[in-house]
Amino acid sequence: MSEDLAIKLNDCTSKGYVIAPAGFGKTHLIAMAVRASGGRQLILTHTFAGVNSIKTKMADLGVRASQFQVDTIASWALRLCLAYPKASGWKIENPTSKQWNKLYECCSHLLGKRFIREAVSSSYIGLYVDEYQDCSDVQHDLVCNLAEFLPSRLLGDPLQSIFDFDDGKPVDWEVSVYPKFDCLGQLEVPWRWVKAKSPELGEWLKNVRRKIELGQKIDLLAQLPPSVIRTYTQPEYLAAKQYTALCGMLNNNESVIALHGGDNQSKNKTHLLAKTMAGRFSSIEEIEGKDLHSFIKKLVAVKTVQAGFLLVVKFAMKCLTGVPSALTAGTRRGEVTKLRSTTKYPLVLQAANDYLTDPSSSHLKAFFETLKSNPETSAYRRDLLYRFLNVLKIHIDGQATTLVEAGILYQREMRHSGRPINHRKLIGTTLLVKGLEYDHAVILDADSLDAKDLYVAMTRGAKSLTIIGTVRHLPA
């Protein structure tokens, strides 16, 4: 029972871990354990979406605000180091992606100091770390330093450890967790599927998990619950099957995630498929937004307005289908073009001419807005498009002096606000949707996924799972 496990977590005076499979009520468990606490607990996770999810669950279960503080590991470590700049050796308020590991090292060193331990101990009586499989090795070192003087509970799922760290590696549970932390328990009820009235799917996924842990294969010709749809295809018909499967998901307003694996090559596949679907499904971007920031840097570096506009058109084609059809031949060449009675889309032409005459952010935003509402076009990378429109708004409103600064500022804001997209039909990679829940999940190329990617993909849909592939047994 999770109530008993919550009490066990609250009573823990040393350091332990809980195995929490996807969709089994981990956030609920944390909230119940904290509700039983006689003091203030520190809860650390990895994303601001995770922070908000925990806060919402705390409110739902009536946990008092005085009983907890929830934050990301990154922002908590940064704030502690900035509070003691001399002792920590850290003064950078906005670290770049390559500076975070150094920050974690500084924070770990700081936590070794007696006066810091006393300060932290006076603020909290215990620690919870959520989504522990997403910890890097340097974050794990930081947590271990906290665990030396605070009762610490780690909650996570080694089967979902698919994060790619630019500089560092994910924590190895076999080496760093199991031998050094006590096992406090494992969650057993697949609540996500129980609540979605798909208990058979939940039990099937629980069995799938057991097989993956034992290194066994999943037989897709064995009896499957009605909510698991196996779509067999020959390799040469894979793209056609993907298209047909997604078209079949368009007749309702329920959320759908179509998934490729988490490798770099798969990112391009998601955008290509969204383009093929003419934007009826929209692809999602990596949090870092490399394509956006690369474009902004190129745009501000151009020597001529014409060269800048040609870059703009190229970027627009990365976001929307049908862009060339909405532009006149002269506009496509980056020329101010005269409006004629035969001009098919005068509003687009006028917006392009305005930008070519005065290349301001307001004219650029107007051009994209006009393109977006044109009948020839359809946004297929809404996430990318809306991020860029938000960057332009920040620049127009005077919150940043340059477009590059506006991009950096928006990137920081987005970590709190989340992706600027509310489209219900999405295409992404396992890496981008880990921890998220949708009504339906479609695995686009099951043969290509390893065991962990496969498990993450299979557990995203609360009501149904469609598996497209060429083989009978998975992982292939």
Ranges and model annotations:
Residues 1-476:
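The feature marks helicase ATPase cores and/or their adjacent C-terminal helical subdomains
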